[in-house]
């Protein structure tokens, strides 16, 4: 009787461990497809990521790493994605493109906001404001009956020739203006992705500017979406759970990493080089000042980690998040990461998907739902400022 009881207890313990402890070979869970030629499985220093939307699904088979990233040479600063505590990556969807953040559980989310109303000015033209405010703003009509659309809390201006111009501010969205010839101009800025504490990645979506990805405490990545113009790169942030969040406000955000949200990627470093300031490839990677709550990652031997030593992994539901000190049970990929042409790769692919979940977009390695859209993860190198 005692013997059978001991056997039952031992069986229960082994079953419990199997459910909570991943396979001991988790560090070799990489895609079967090899990393592309010329990619690097090592990066000297820390870096963040910025969400870049792929223009069309039909372009996925022929799209190159540099074709979808519009760089502003006049802008010298790029803002990264942030990470929250759980390690998840989230992208907020508030009216514009904002940075990705990572929350404590490691998921990636993208928040969304409501659109603003159209105003009509005296000339009869219709204007539509594109600022990141949650409340709707009315349409204005000018003298000639045209309707103008304001892109910020500020009004649209018209110069002597009748053209309409829209100024682009780095930290806040500026209004559309009209110059003397009647043409309309619109300025743009880009914001980074952030990571919150859970490791999730969030990406806010601002019309006027793209914000960085952030990571929250659980390692999830979130990307917020607010209304702002996009011309300056903003960083991803990380919160306590390791999730990655990307805010979409007009202000530039830097990729931040907090308590538990790490990311790791393994690969074959023998055939690849390490990126550094002296390498030609580093010239394609924008630089940004690091700050609190930004998703900061390291890449060694194709293993991706955050500053909390959490693994960057694709978990059972195909979501990209940071877990640690070792990946969670059921992890699909925990290695095979690399950098090429300024983009983050998993295996031979640099295409990921942001999928709307409530107020945020989560990041996945596959198209798991109809509300998902293809994106790329642009690398931002952090420097001391």
From Swiss-Prot:
<feature type="site" description="Covalent attachment to cell wall glycan">
    <location>
        <position position="88"/>
    </location>
</feature>
<keyword id="KW-0325">Glycoprotein</keyword>
<dbReference type="InterPro" id="IPR000420">
    <property type="entry name" value="Yeast_PIR_rpt"/>
</dbReference>
<dbReference type="Pfam" id="PF22799">
    <property type="entry name" value="PIR1-like_C"/>
</dbReference>
<feature type="repeat" description="PIR1/2/3 5">
    <location>
        <begin position="154"/>
        <end position="171"/>
    </location>
</feature>
<dbReference type="GO" id="GO:0005199">
    <property type="term" value="F:structural constituent of cell wall"/>
</dbReference>
<feature type="site" description="Covalent attachment to cell wall glycan">
    <location>
        <position position="125"/>
    </location>
</feature>
<feature type="site" description="Covalent attachment to cell wall glycan">
    <location>
        <position position="243"/>
    </location>
</feature>
<keyword id="KW-0961">Cell wall biogenesis/degradation</keyword>
<keyword id="KW-0964">Secreted</keyword>
<dbReference type="InterPro" id="IPR054508">
    <property type="entry name" value="PIR1-like_C"/>
</dbReference>
<feature type="repeat" description="PIR1/2/3 2">
    <location>
        <begin position="97"/>
        <end position="115"/>
    </location>
</feature>
<comment type="similarity">
    <text>Belongs to the PIR protein family.</text>
</comment>
<feature type="site" description="Covalent attachment to cell wall glycan">
    <location>
        <position position="163"/>
    </location>
</feature>
<feature type="repeat" description="PIR1/2/3 4">
    <location>
        <begin position="136"/>
        <end position="153"/>
    </location>
</feature>
<dbReference type="GO" id="GO:0005576">
    <property type="term" value="C:extracellular region"/>
</dbReference>
<protein>
    <recommendedName>
        <fullName>Cell wall mannoprotein PIR1</fullName>
    </recommendedName>
</protein>
<keyword id="KW-0732">Signal</keyword>
<feature type="glycosylation site" description="N-linked (GlcNAc...) asparagine">
    <location>
        <position position="272"/>
    </location>
</feature>
<comment type="function">
    <text>Component of the outer cell wall layer required for stability of the cell wall and specifically for cell wall rigidity.</text>
</comment>
<feature type="repeat" description="PIR1/2/3 7">
    <location>
        <begin position="191"/>
        <end position="208"/>
    </location>
</feature>
<dbReference type="GO" id="GO:0031505">
    <property type="term" value="P:fungal-type cell wall organization"/>
</dbReference>
<keyword id="KW-0677">Repeat</keyword>
<feature type="site" description="Covalent attachment to cell wall glycan">
    <location>
        <position position="107"/>
    </location>
</feature>
<feature type="repeat" description="PIR1/2/3 6">
    <location>
        <begin position="173"/>
        <end position="190"/>
    </location>
</feature>
<feature type="site" description="Covalent attachment to cell wall glycan">
    <location>
        <position position="220"/>
    </location>
</feature>
<dbReference type="GO" id="GO:0009277">
    <property type="term" value="C:fungal-type cell wall"/>
</dbReference>
<feature type="site" description="Covalent attachment to cell wall glycan">
    <location>
        <position position="146"/>
    </location>
</feature>
<feature type="signal peptide">
    <location>
        <begin position="1"/>
        <end position="18"/>
    </location>
</feature>
<feature type="repeat" description="PIR1/2/3 1">
    <location>
        <begin position="78"/>
        <end position="96"/>
    </location>
</feature>
<feature type="repeat" description="PIR1/2/3 8">
    <location>
        <begin position="210"/>
        <end position="228"/>
    </location>
</feature>
<feature type="site" description="Covalent attachment to cell wall glycan">
    <location>
        <position position="183"/>
    </location>
</feature>
<dbReference type="InterPro" id="IPR051153">
    <property type="entry name" value="Yeast_CWMannoprotein_PIR"/>
</dbReference>
<dbReference type="GO" id="GO:0071502">
    <property type="term" value="P:cellular response to temperature stimulus"/>
</dbReference>
<feature type="region of interest" description="Disordered">
    <location>
        <begin position="257"/>
        <end position="282"/>
    </location>
</feature>
<feature type="site" description="Covalent attachment to cell wall glycan">
    <location>
        <position position="200"/>
    </location>
</feature>
<dbReference type="GO" id="GO:0030445">
    <property type="term" value="C:yeast-form cell wall"/>
</dbReference>
<feature type="repeat" description="PIR1/2/3 3">
    <location>
        <begin position="116"/>
        <end position="133"/>
    </location>
</feature>
<keyword id="KW-0134">Cell wall</keyword>
<feature type="repeat" description="PIR1/2/3 9">
    <location>
        <begin position="233"/>
        <end position="251"/>
    </location>
</feature>
<dbReference type="GO" id="GO:0062040">
    <property type="term" value="C:fungal biofilm matrix"/>
</dbReference>
